[in-house]
Structures are given as structure tokens and as C-alpha cells.
A protein has these predicted regions:
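A short glycine-rich, Lys/Arg-flanked "PGG" loop and its adjoining helix->strand segment in the class I
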Residues: 133-147
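Conserved class I S-adenosyl-L-methionine
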Residues: 4-53, 55-64, 67, 146-173, 206-207, 215-216
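A C-terminal cap/extension of S-adenosyl-L-methionine-dependent methyltransferases
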Residues: 194-233
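Short alpha-helix
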Residues: 173-197
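Class I SAM-dependent methyltransferase SAM/SAH-binding core
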Residues: 65-109
């Protein structure tokens, strides 16, 4: 199984390849020691950036099998997971049939009114959406307080290993961006206090990787997952 959250997000775009993957196998990867470490590191970063409080409403755009969605629900949030793939949504519903609202939808045209959620998150999903700028605008539109969006980072060791030449394995066809390129997606949008953070500096997941993940500040822009967070105006 490939590294971190992008594996389950690779096929988010309409007509994309995620429909070829097995939802159960992807979700089970997070039960492995390496998968659990990577997923937890990413979740902790995104949760901190969102500044959530119990009882807040949160939308997970491109939720896939709902691994991150369930983690946010465990923190006492009122969570909605959105994904275009009905098979993956069915898997997510089976894992959590009552506490979370699961919605079929497209990131480029979110089926919610303006300012519907206190926070909005997306984890390595927009890298595979044809119009990322439109998807970002939609996330900002439905967020009432804060948002955090994770992308695959071109300025990372993971890119050197998996992203060059069009990408390999689960990363084939993904768009990789440098942090300054991502900030341009927010130009002209009603946002403030944009910040860049990253996680998973050494994707191998061994003891050295875990130690470095604890020691390095997440303000360094070199992790495999780069997150842009901010507030809506």
C-alpha cells in the first residue's frame, strides 16, 4: 500500500481512477503501524489548524472511506462527509451508520448553502480534481470560520520518490504543487490569515522518520502533505 492519505483520495475527480480501488483494503491500511502513524500525524496537524471545538460542524470534502471523517467525529464534532463515489460512501456509511452524515457530491459544486459549516477540511483530494481553483472557492464559500486543505507537496521527499514523471503507483496523474503555487488559489477570495504547514517529512515511517516528525516544526514546507489553512471573512 502506498503512503498516507492520498492513496484513498487519488480518484476523487469525476471519471477518475479511484473506482478501481478497493475501499476496504484502503481503509484497512490505516490499521497497519505505518498507516496509523501517518494518518494520525496528518489528523493532528489538520485538527490543530482548524481550531475545532466540540459541537462545531465540519465538512470533509473528498472523504473517501471516511477514515479522517470518523476521527473528527470522535472529537465531538458534528461531521458531514462528501464524496462522489457511491461505493466508497456505502463503505463509509457501513462503518458509521448514525453519527456522521454522508453526502454524494462534487467538490467543484458543493450542495450546501453559503457558510454552512464552522470548519471545512479536505485531505489530499483536490490534487485529482480537474478545477482545483473552483474547488477551493467552494470550500471557502461553505466555511463559516476556518478551513484546512491538504495537497501533495512538490517540494518534498515524497515527490522525489513517487511524483516525478507523471507519478507512480497510486500517485499516477496527481497534481503536485509547491506551497507558493497553492497560495495563489486563494487570490481574490474572502479569506485572511493564510498559513502554510506540512507533515510527513520522511514517508518511510521508520523510527528515524517518526523522531524527525516530532522534532521538526510543521511550519517547514517540506512534508509530503502540505496544508493551507485560514479564516473566512
Amino acid at each position: 500500500m502506498e503512503t498516507f492519505a492520498a492513496v484513498g483520495r487519488v480518484f476523487f475527480a469525476a471519471g477518475g481512477r479511484r473506482r478501481l480501488m478497493d475501499a476496504a483494503a484502503y481503509d484497512a491500511w490505516y490499521d497497519t503501524p505505518r498507516g496509523r502513524w501517518i494518518g494520525t500525524a496528518e489528523f493532528r496537524l489538520l485538527s490543530r489548524l482548524l481550531q475545532t471545538q466540540p459541537g462545531n460542524t465540519l465538512l470533509d470534502v473528498g472523504c473517501g472511506t471516511g477514515w479522517f471523517t470518523r476521527r473528527f467525529a470522535e472529537e465531538g464534532l458534528l461531521v458531514t462527509g462528501l464524496d462522489p463515489n457511491p461505493d466508497w460512501l456505502a463503505f463509509a456509511r457501513a462503518k458509521d451508520p448514525t453519527a456522521i452524515r454522508w453526502v454524494a457530491g462534487d467538490a467543484r459544486s458543493l450542495p450546501f448553502p453559503d457558510r454552512s459549516f464552522d470548519q471545512v477540511v479536505s485531505v489530499a483530494a483536490l490534487c485529482f480534481v480537474e478545477d482545483e481553483r473552483q474547488a477551493v472557492a467552494e470550500i471557502v464559500r461553505v466555511a463559516r470560520q476556518r478551513f484546512a486543505i491538504g495537497w501533495l507537496n512538490r517540494a518534498s521527499l515524497l515527490y522525489a520518490q513517487k511524483g516525478q514523471g507523471g507519478g507512480s503507483g497510486a500517485y499516477y496523474g496527481a497534481r503536485w504543487h509547491r506551497p507558493d503555487e497553492l497560495l495563489d488559489f486563494f487570490s481574490g477570495l474572502p479569506v485572511r490569515r493564510l498559513a502554510v504547514h506540512s507533515a510527513i517529512f520522511l514517508p518511510a515511517g521508520n523510527r528515524v522518520a517518526r523522531t524527525m516528525e516530532r522534532l521538526l516544526p510543521h511550519t517547514l514546507p517540506w512534508g509530503g502533505l502540505v496544508a493551507i489553512s485560514g479564516e473566512t471573512e
